[in-house]
Amino acid sequence: MKQTVWHHLKLCPQGDPQNTLPDAAIAVENGTIVWLGAASSLPADYAAWPREDLHGAWVTPGLVDCHTHLVYGGQRADEFAQRLAGVSYEEIARQGGGIVSTVRATRAADEASLFRQSAARLEPLLAEGVTTVEIKSGYGLDLASERKMLRVARQLGERYPVTVYTTFLGAHALPPEFAGRADAYIDEVCNTMLPALADEGLVDAVDVFCERIGFSLEQSERVFNAAERYKLPVKMHAEQLSNGGGTALAARHRALSADHLEFLDEAGVAAMKEAGTVAVLLPGAYYFIRETQLPPLELLRRYQVPVAISTDSNPGTSPATSLLLMMNMATTLFRMTVPEVLQGVTSHAARALGKADRHGSLEAGRAADFAVWSVDSLAELAYWIGRPLCARVVRAGETVYTRRELS
């Protein structure tokens, strides 16, 4: 039985920098928080436990990256260089590039290679205090390759000190062998892929890319209906490039989240509020593809829709492995406040996964997953660009990452 009192710390237990304790302690037993609060109120039952002095550092919940595509083969830096030289995305696609090139590389990679490539993208997130990650499939687009991606995602959670939740995104794009036959491909997703992967226990949620260049409302709803037959929660890539009504559809199905949302309108915001659907904003993609349409943050505030922030880490539109950078981008590009972005990577991000009862906040009865920061103010988490701020990561009461000793 391991018992530890973490003390001499400043605590932000709910991810809200307006709700903090300046001199706090956390009592942890066998990886679970049994008490936390003002150090002066530490119960006598814990007074004799071994102590871990954090020297006045800030402690927040472990960060949650709630929308990633971390598992894939290859990268597309050469295409990035082509686009900078003026080659259009359409021309790159005609040359066999774009998402098809990632599908090709992912299908060709074996599990060991895919694991190594994906682990290299996960490790920087862990070093920034991330203890929970969502990972989507969607670059295999056939049963064997989607299975391989989800198996690798599960392995990352088993071999790294991070909790991984998997999302089946078979309806991400149309694979080359189904060109011109989108409905037939959705048949494959709903009738072959999802049943097999769900039966194997590889799927925690189901996503769909509902967009003019993705799948229609009708096709998206078929995927949602299939997910519901397996009692799997749903989420949606919606209103990124146009307002197609995807968010309203997601809300009707009580989606955990709707993500991107640059073209979201008031009716969609109202539907999200009614359904309890979280808005996941992805500033990395907005920045990388030079979008100009801002997500409707004022509407989301007015309707009190919870807003999460994530990396959207992927090879084509957001090759990002820094959640702290996304916090900075959300403040500078989207005009979000520091409290909004910190909750956006803690409590609201956990809610976007349907896991607010487990992650995103620190309280008695929950796993002792937290990040320790070398900062004077929590605003620094969104302020610095490229500066390593995380001194220590604690998962289930054990230090799993240390950058430097606190003093």
UniProtKB/Swiss-Prot annotation:
<dbReference type="GO" id="GO:0005506">
    <property type="term" value="F:iron ion binding"/>
</dbReference>
<feature type="binding site">
    <location>
        <position position="240"/>
    </location>
    <ligand>
        <name>4-imidazolone-5-propanoate</name>
    </ligand>
</feature>
<dbReference type="GO" id="GO:0019556">
    <property type="term" value="P:L-histidine catabolic process to glutamate and formamide"/>
</dbReference>
<feature type="binding site">
    <location>
        <position position="67"/>
    </location>
    <ligand>
        <name>Fe(3+)</name>
    </ligand>
</feature>
<feature type="binding site">
    <location>
        <position position="67"/>
    </location>
    <ligand>
        <name>Zn(2+)</name>
    </ligand>
</feature>
<dbReference type="InterPro" id="IPR005920">
    <property type="entry name" value="HutI"/>
</dbReference>
<feature type="binding site">
    <location>
        <position position="312"/>
    </location>
    <ligand>
        <name>Fe(3+)</name>
    </ligand>
</feature>
<keyword id="KW-0862">Zinc</keyword>
<feature type="binding site">
    <location>
        <position position="69"/>
    </location>
    <ligand>
        <name>Fe(3+)</name>
    </ligand>
</feature>
<keyword id="KW-0408">Iron</keyword>
<feature type="binding site">
    <location>
        <position position="317"/>
    </location>
    <ligand>
        <name>4-imidazolone-5-propanoate</name>
    </ligand>
</feature>
<feature type="binding site">
    <location>
        <position position="172"/>
    </location>
    <ligand>
        <name>4-imidazolone-5-propanoate</name>
    </ligand>
</feature>
<keyword id="KW-0963">Cytoplasm</keyword>
<feature type="binding site">
    <location>
        <position position="314"/>
    </location>
    <ligand>
        <name>N-formimidoyl-L-glutamate</name>
    </ligand>
</feature>
<feature type="binding site">
    <location>
        <position position="69"/>
    </location>
    <ligand>
        <name>Zn(2+)</name>
    </ligand>
</feature>
<dbReference type="InterPro" id="IPR032466">
    <property type="entry name" value="Metal_Hydrolase"/>
</dbReference>
<keyword id="KW-0479">Metal-binding</keyword>
<comment type="function">
    <text>Catalyzes the hydrolytic cleavage of the carbon-nitrogen bond in imidazolone-5-propanoate to yield N-formimidoyl-L-glutamate. It is the third step in the universal histidine degradation pathway.</text>
</comment>
<dbReference type="Pfam" id="PF01979">
    <property type="entry name" value="Amidohydro_1"/>
</dbReference>
<feature type="binding site">
    <location>
        <position position="139"/>
    </location>
    <ligand>
        <name>N-formimidoyl-L-glutamate</name>
    </ligand>
</feature>
<dbReference type="InterPro" id="IPR006680">
    <property type="entry name" value="Amidohydro-rel"/>
</dbReference>
<protein>
    <recommendedName>
        <fullName>Imidazolonepropionase</fullName>
        <ecNumber>3.5.2.7</ecNumber>
    </recommendedName>
</protein>
<feature type="binding site">
    <location>
        <position position="316"/>
    </location>
    <ligand>
        <name>N-formimidoyl-L-glutamate</name>
    </ligand>
</feature>
<feature type="binding site">
    <location>
        <position position="312"/>
    </location>
    <ligand>
        <name>Zn(2+)</name>
    </ligand>
</feature>
<dbReference type="GO" id="GO:0050480">
    <property type="term" value="F:imidazolonepropionase activity"/>
</dbReference>
<dbReference type="GO" id="GO:0019557">
    <property type="term" value="P:L-histidine catabolic process to glutamate and formate"/>
</dbReference>
<keyword id="KW-0378">Hydrolase</keyword>
<dbReference type="GO" id="GO:0008270">
    <property type="term" value="F:zinc ion binding"/>
</dbReference>
<feature type="binding site">
    <location>
        <position position="237"/>
    </location>
    <ligand>
        <name>Fe(3+)</name>
    </ligand>
</feature>
<feature type="binding site">
    <location>
        <position position="139"/>
    </location>
    <ligand>
        <name>4-imidazolone-5-propanoate</name>
    </ligand>
</feature>
<dbReference type="GO" id="GO:0005737">
    <property type="term" value="C:cytoplasm"/>
</dbReference>
<feature type="binding site">
    <location>
        <position position="76"/>
    </location>
    <ligand>
        <name>4-imidazolone-5-propanoate</name>
    </ligand>
</feature>
<comment type="pathway">
    <text>Amino-acid degradation; L-histidine degradation into L-glutamate; N-formimidoyl-L-glutamate from L-histidine: step 3/3.</text>
</comment>
<comment type="similarity">
    <text>Belongs to the metallo-dependent hydrolases superfamily. HutI family.</text>
</comment>
<dbReference type="InterPro" id="IPR011059">
    <property type="entry name" value="Metal-dep_hydrolase_composite"/>
</dbReference>
<feature type="binding site">
    <location>
        <position position="237"/>
    </location>
    <ligand>
        <name>Zn(2+)</name>
    </ligand>
</feature>
<keyword id="KW-0369">Histidine metabolism</keyword>
